[in-house]
Amino acid sequence: MAPAILAVINGYLQEKGLSLRQGTIVDATIIHAPSSTRNKDGERDPEMHQTKKGNQYFFGMKAHIGADVESGLVHHVHGTAANVADVTQVAELLHGEENAVYADAGYTGVEKREEHENREVIWQIAARRSTYSKLNKRSLLYKAKRKIEYCKAQTRAKVEHPFRVIKRQFGYVKVRFRGLMKNTAQLTTLFALSNLWMARKRLMGLGELRT
């Protein structure tokens, strides 16, 4: 049901010209699960896992999304345990019509993975700073690389909007159920609603919404 809701909303938004489907930005965020919540046998949710991000440990799941490069609207949602590597889930987030895929440095090497062997897209993955930090900062090559990375970052920033909407506007910061299936279904519905939220001003401009 949840994927169908997302598909219907996105079909409507695409009809209104709000999703061009020329490129996809992929990203993921951790959704916390209460580590103290246990079932009647005293066990934590076996589908949730612990992961380390920076110097902090988190317990829960990950929401992986694919978003339109122009509008930032979400077209694919995939849920996994928190310890699953982001780069392994990209195939679940693409609609197949994009000509470019944008992602942060955590997705380095994605283009070499077997599942993307015949995928004809331009991979716009953020370069790790270490790949150009040793260059002379006054050189044209360094300045060009910095400018390219800045442009990539501006594009990737759009994928943060739906995460912010579900966490701040909708107050979704922790999983509500046990297991990945139910929580992924709820996340998919929330991202579908976040698309309407993010497109509301443009829809009002088209006379599609009334205040």
Predicted feature locations:
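Residue-level marker of positions within ordered structural domains that often coincide
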Residues: 70, 171, 197
